[in-house]
From Swiss-Prot:
It comes from the Eukaryota. Forms disulfide-linked homodimers at the cell surface. Interacts with LCK. Interacts with PTK2/FAK1. Binds to P4HB/PDI. Interacts with IL16; this interaction induces a CD4-dependent signaling in lymphocytes. Interacts (via Ig-like V-type domain) with MHCII alpha chain (via alpha-2 domain) and beta chain (via beta-2 domain); this interaction increases the affinity of TCR for peptide-MHCII. CD4 oligomerization via Ig-like C2-type 2 and 3 domains appears to be required for stable binding to MHCII and adhesion between T cells and APCs. Residues 26-396 are extracellular. This is T-cell surface glycoprotein CD4. Glycans are attached at residues 42, 296, 325. It comes from Macaca nemestrina (Pig-tailed macaque). Pfam families: C2-set (PF05790), CD4-extracel (PF09191), ig (PF00047), Tcell_CD4_C (PF12104). Residues 126-203, 204-317, 318-374 form the Ig-like C2-type domain.
């Protein structure tokens, strides 16, 4: 019995010695679809020696015969290679190009009667739709993975947005700051592989902008895009809602072709001017109160569903003096937090309100400033000069004028009255003289009827 135990041990040692190679621990390598991976295999001695790479089905992929690289009948024969320059250093790695998901397998390197097993897991991460998406659209990323794997994915946008999940990741509402290179990390068996995905969010650089102008100044509207494309074609329109108007109207329509802009239609009031090159640029000749309001510029790109939008606001300021009233007004969309002020330069006289109009009665002479401010920051300023007025005896002068007019009218009336009276007396005297002359000639009336017609009582 005691002699049998050493014999069994000896038999086990002989069986181990007869094994062609010793298998080392399996390594796990993660690869990316379409990329290149290098599976390492190192000999204990730094010299050129025989080696072979096989898959899990023991099909030869490549190896060395003499000093030449030979390839087997595997499906990787046209994509597998080895670094010949490193053979003398005992490095017999296998390089696989243009990785595919089905390349995921266990690969065996046989060198110096030893075996090294490398498990290759190939993953692919792609966007389900076009990587050029309009602002507000959804982004979906899908992970391709080999059967039997259970990876996790974490992605980070250029704007710092983090999403994570399994084989599908979704971003419901893309924002303009999401445009750029997304970094996604796939984890499996405590190993990681990193993907870079370029996402282009089609949007304007700003969602909204406000232009502040004094009455009569020229207005410039600019709509820069947050992306660049080699070929950019589409059409656009600017709708405007003036503060004083009951409804909005189209101010201008245009076409965009190969980054060149051509105007299709423009209103006559106001008559906008548009630049012919990007960025989109509009000029309003004069800022007037009737133009103050809000506009919405839309841009529809060819082969894309939906439109790009940018809101633009125009605020117009007017400072006027009428009789004894100095007024400062603004028109257009303003925040209730904004402050409107009238301030006399170099003096402490100031009138401020969170309103769209302020005024001063009987203002002092000097340069007045009309200011629109936001938390102390001046957004718009207009100056108006008030000249000094000297007091004049307005009432006595008026009385003198009125008295003169009344006297003239009275004198004229008396003159007319006396002229008429004098004329009447003259006619009466002429008639009396005629009667006396007739009587003196002893001409009397022959009948009462003639007397009544020709004679008048004395």
């Amino acid at each position: 019995m005691n002699r049998g135990i050493p014999f069994r041990h000896l038999l086990l040692v002989l069986q181990l010695a007869l094994l062609p190679a010793v298998t080392q621990g399996k390594k796990v390598v993660l690869g990316k679809k379409g990329d290149t991976v290098e599976l390492t295999c190192n000999a204990s001695q730094k010299k050129n020696t025989q080696f072979h790479w096989k898959n899990s089905d023991q099909i030869k992929i490549l190896g060395i015969q003499g000093s030449f690289l030979t390839k087997g009948p595997s499906k990787l024969s046209d994509r597998a290679d080895s670094r010949k320059s490193l053979w003398d250093q005992g490095c017999f790695s296998m390089i696989i190009k243009n990785l595919k998901i089905e390349d995921s397998n266990t690969y065996i390197c046989e060198v110096e009667n030893e075996k090294e097993e490398v498990e290759l897991l190939v993953f692919g991460l792609t966007a389900n739709s076009d990587t050029h998406l309009l602002e507000g659209q959804s982004l979906t990323l899908t992970l391709e993975s080999p059967p039997g794997s259970s990876p996790s994915v974490k992605c980070r946008s250029p704007g710092g947005k983090n999403i994570q999940g399994g084989r599908t990741l979704s971003v419901p509402q893309l924002e303009r700051q999401d445009s750029g290179t997304w970094t996604c990390t796939v984890s499996q068996d405590q190993k990681t592989v990193e993907f870079k995905i370029d996402i282009v969010v089609l949007a304007f650089q700003k969602a909204s902008s406000t232009v502040y102008k004094k009455e009569g100044e020229q207005v410039e509207f600019s709509f820069p895009l947050a992306f660049t494309l080699e070929k950019l074609t589409g059409s656009g329109e600017l709708w405007w809602q003036a503060e004083r108007a009951s409804s909005s109207k189209s101010w201008i329509t245009f076409d965009l072709k190969n980054k060149e802009v051509s105007v299709k239609r423009v209103t006559q009031d106001p008559k906008l001017q548009m630049g012919k090159k990007l960025p989109l640029h509009l000029t309003l000749p004069q800022a007037l109160p009737q133009y103050a309001g809000s506009g919405n510029l839309t841009l529809a790109l060819d082969a894309k569903t939906g439109k790009l939008h940018q809101e633009v606001n125009l605020v117009v300021m007017r400072a006027t003096q009428f009789q004894e009233n100095l007024t400062c007004e603004v028109w257009g969309p303003t925040s209730p937090k904004l402050t409107l002020s009238l301030k006399l330069e170099n003096k402490g006289t100031t009138v401020s309100k969170q309103a769209k109009a302020v005024w001063v009665l009987n203002p002092e002479a000097g340069m007045w400033q009309c200011l629109l401010s936001d938390s102390g920051q001046v957004l718009l300023e207009s100056n108006i000069k008030v000249v000094p007025t000297w007091p004049t005896p307005v009432q006595p002068m008026a009385l003198i004028v009125l008295g003169g007019v009344a006297g003239l009218l009275l004198f004229t009336g008396l003159g007319i009255f006396f002229c008429v009276r004098c004329r009447h007396r003259r006619r009466q005297a002429e008639r009396m003289s005629q009667i006396k002359r007739l009587l003196s000639e002893k001409k009397t009336c022959q009948c009462p009827h003639w007397f009544q017609k020709t004679c008048s009582p004395i």
